[in-house]
Amino acid sequence: MDFFTHFVVPFAILTLLNLRSLDIKDRLSGGFGGISIDFDVILFAIGFLVPELFIFTHRGITHSFIFGLITAMVFIYLISRPSIYGLINYMIKRDIRVEFNWRAVSLAYFGVLTHLFLDFLTTGGIPLFYPFSLTRFTATIYYYTDPVTTIVALAVLVILYLRLKPKYKKIALAAFLIMLVSFGGIRVGDKMEAL
């Protein structure tokens, strides 16, 4: 799945749960956790230069249950630093401040789990149980990146950015999740017919 979808899905779930105890910082923590493990692209050079260290590639070490948690913790810590969130706030003209605490890390890990589930549904597979196993798991329901899903997720992010009433934002989030599940259902149906 794409970067935008990995942010929108946990953010949407946490928003649509409509729990009073979840504020915008909590929902942002989930969304940031959803994208945190894709910053493994920074490790790409290691896996490219030293093929024996292939686990240091995109969809490598950070796409496991254990290292996903570690990555989420580091990511939430970094973006909770005033210099980092100050720069981001300045660039996008929105307050995206999150706090580094166990609640934020737990919600970020929820984002990681949604990310792992979405990537499990795509082609290529992910090493969920690394370092205990190098086996890559996949359901091959979605393509690695689906252009329609990417475009719709980006449109939802634009809607979230605009100063619209919360009910319209919730409608966009719900519609996106319905679309994502529907596409998955259609593809599962196609796979079953092919068997």
Where do the model's predicted regions map?
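N-terminal membrane-targeting hydrophobic helices
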Residues: 1-195
